[in-house]
Amino acid sequence: MKYGFVRVGAGIPEIRVADPQYNVEEIEKLILKAQGQGVEILVTPELSLTGYTCQDLFFQQTLLDEAEVALMKLMDFTRSMDMIIVVGMPVKCNIGLANCAVVLQKGKIQGIVAKTYLPNCNECAEKRWFTSIHDIKDAKVWLCGDLIEIKQRTVFNTPSCSFGIEMGHDLLAPVPPSSHLAMMGAEIILNLSAESTLVGKDDFLRKQIAAQSARCIGGYVYAGAGFGESSTDLVFNAQALIYENGNILAENLPFCTEAQ
C-alpha cells in the first residue's frame, strides 16, 4: 500500500488447453511483469492452469495431476515474493471436481475458494464437469502436500486490505457471493472468469461490474479468459477490468493475441 492505495492487477496469460506446464510458465512471466510494476495482488482467469475449455479432459486424472505439479512449480517460483497471486484450477474433492481459485503468497497456499453458481444452459455445461460449493460443504482436500479446506465465502486479510473471491457467472447471480463478502468486510472483490463473448455482452458486463462495485462500495478486479482457449463452441476476448465504487479505473485491449 502507498498513500492508502493498493495496486492490483488482472493478468491474462496466453495459454494452451490441457497443458498446465506451458500455462504455468506463461503465468510466471506475467508475475515478473506485475512485480516490476509494483502489483500487490494479481488475479488470473478462471481455470488458468489448465484452460477453461478442456471439456471431458477434466475427467482425466493425468490432467488433474499435471495441474497440481504446475501449482507446486508456481509455489516454488513465488516463495520469495510478497505479492498475492490467485490462479484457477480444478481440484478433486470427496464428491466430485470443484472449479477453484487458489490464493498463493510466499510459496504457500493461503486458501482455496470454489465456484458457487455453475452455468448450465445454452453454450455452457459446467455441471457436466464440476460440483458447486453448495454441494461440497467446505470439504478438506490434500493439495501439494497440505490439507486445505475448500471455502465458499472467505475474506482474506492483508496488512493493506481485505479481499474476497467470486468466479465468472457468480457475478450474474441474483445475489452474488461478492455481496456477502462485502458485508463480511471485503474491500476488494477478485473475479476469475471465462465468460464467452457475444455481441453486446462486453457492455453488459461493464455495467454489471460497475453496479456491483458500487453496491459493495469497493474495488472489483475482473480477469477473463483469452487467447489459447478453444474456439470450437465459444469465443473469449481476454477482457480485464478494474472498477472502484462504480467507476472504471483500468481496462485492457480486448481480443489481444498476446499475454497482458
Q: How would you name each of these model-derived features?
A:
Residues 1-260:
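Enzyme catalytic cores with a strong preference for nitrogen-chemistry domains
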